[in-house]
Amino acid sequence: MKALLVISALIINSGTFLWAQEVPATEKPWNFGVDANFYFIPDDFLVLPVFKADKNKLHLEARYNYEDRETFSAWAGYNFMGGKKVEYTITPMLGGVVGLSNGIAPGLEFTFTYKGFEIYNESEFLFEFESIENNFYYQWTDLTYSPNDWFWFGISGQRTRLYKTDLDVQRGLLAGGAYKSWELTGYLYNLGFDDPFVLLTLSISF
């Protein structure tokens, strides 16, 4: 219970601080995004939902089954956006983790786009409350090329505790498409190794 109270206070204070940094004259509406990640793992199946909310510089995020199974995390961050030829969004964040794993995690998300090429990364370092031996570095990186507005393909890498193999980083191929506010991306990881698996990510923004 103490851990939950500490995490809640940190997230609330972080969000309040970030919101107070800049209040533009013209307020922009909230932008929301929901991802449902379906992991088709050999002899197992896992759903990893993610909810994101952005307003101006403020970024809020909630995840389940991300840092660990049956584990919830809540995040507050600050968006840095800009660029002309190379467009970028960089979001440092702070998160609290509660469930089978409990702790606090600094994190970072960034996207760099140049013409049809894009690199997206989300990473964090979890400091476990119970044992320093359970500290863990997470990372998910996608490098894609989009020949048009509705199709993309590329490569991906994940470092996670959800699925353990002989590989420290799960590596794979991806392809996806978009229709209006919806996106669907398919991943095939560890092809050619002993334990390949499939990930389908369904996303909607509004």
Role assignments for model-derived ranges:
Residues 21-29, 81-88, 150:
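Short loop/turn motifs that connect adjacent beta-strands in outer-membrane beta-barrel proteins
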Residues 30-31, 38-44, 57, 66-70, ...:
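Outer-membrane beta-barrel transmembrane domain signature
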Residues 46-48:
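Conserved internal helical-beta-strand scaffold that buttresses enzyme catalytic cores
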Residues 1-29, 206:
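Cleavable N-terminal export/targeting peptides
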Residues 72-96:
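Glycine/small-residue-rich loop that forms an oxyanion/phosphate-binding "nest" at active or ligand-binding sites
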